[in-house]
Amino acid sequence: MALAPSKVSTFSGFSPKPSVGGAQKNPTCSVSLSFLNEKLGSRNLRVCASTVPLTGVIFEPFEEVKKSELAVPTAPQVSLARQNYADECESAINEQINVEYNASYVYHSLFAYFDRDNVALKGFAKFFKESSEEEREHAEKLMKYQNTRGGRVVLHAIKNVPSEFEHVEKGDALYAMELALSLEKLVNEKLLNVHSVADRNNDPQMADFIESEFLSEQVESIKKISEYVAQLRRVGKGHGVWHFDQRLLD
């Protein structure tokens, strides 16, 4: 269908064509256009708009907020912000807080070991101190999220960790890094469990929080420490450990 430029009329105003008998019917036709069809000849196109008002109410906020699940609590110990936050999700977040704090505690013990004067691997000490701080930040981030959703933070006990990390066959550097790799995989497993709890309780906000704030970073940490383990296995327990330690200081 081709438009014929010479046949197209200009807008003729907004006066609709009256119906038979002079009474205007709905819909109102306000614009008339002409176009040329090669087979059918000249045709008119009329643009119409209905004048029938909308009578149905789409949204009544003052009625909707009367639902019981939207009622604002009055008890002093009840969260005002909590909505669609299952008890299982709240418990899972508290458990993950404990996991992160325990991981931080292990890394802090490793930092103290490598910082000793008779071990003196400052690069390893720096790496494990930063790892400890990172896990603690993760715990604090989870605590903040718990409060955001209207849950209550419950801190569980932190287990005692060893203070000696010497290993006869592997040496302390490789042994400590393999321990760190196992720990990162364990934390990742726990995070995936928290994500499954969110899915099971149909909580997309919590699932998105775990995905965006933790999971990607966790697999990157696993990859990095895996490379450290592979490199330490190559250098052995001797002079190569010192060179690797210097690299961690950079």
UniProtKB/Swiss-Prot annotation:
Protein name, per record: Ferritin, chloroplastic
Binding residues annotated for Fe cation 1, in chain numbering: E100, E135, H138
Main location group: plastid
Transit peptide (residue range): 1-49
Organismal lineage: Eukaryota, Viridiplantae, Streptophyta, Embryophyta, Tracheophyta
A Pfam family matched in the record: Ferritin
Reaction catalysis annotation: 4 Fe(2+) + O2 + 4 H(+) = 4 Fe(3+) + 2 H2O
Region called Extension peptide (EP), residue ranges: 50-82
Transit peptide in keyword set: yes
Assembly behavior: Oligomer of 24 subunits. There are two types of subunits: L (light) chain and H (heavy) chain. The major chain can be light or heavy, depending on the species and tissue type. The functional molecule forms a roughly spherical shell with a diameter of 12 nm and contains a central cavity into which the insoluble mineral iron core is deposited.
GO BP annotations listed: intracellular iron ion homeostasis; iron ion transport
GO annotation, cellular component aspect: chloroplast
Localization: Plastid, Chloroplast
MF (Gene Ontology): ferric iron binding; ferrous iron binding; ferroxidase activity
InterPro entries per the UniProt record, alphabetical: Ferritin, Ferritin-like, Ferritin-like_diiron, Ferritin-like_SF, Ferritin_CS, Ferritin_DPS_dom
Known role: Stores iron in a soluble, non-toxic, readily available form. Important for iron homeostasis. Has ferroxidase activity. Iron is taken up in the ferrous form and deposited as ferric hydroxides after oxidation.
Source organism per UniProt: Malus baccata var. xiaojinensis (Apple)
Sequence ranges assigned to domain Ferritin-like diiron in this UniProt record: 83-236
Keywords: Chloroplast, Iron, Iron storage, Metal-binding, Oxidoreductase, Plastid, Transit peptide
Family: Belongs to the ferritin family.
Entry EC no(s): 1.16.3.1
Enzyme class: oxidoreductase
Residues engaged in binding Fe cation 2: E135, E184, Q218
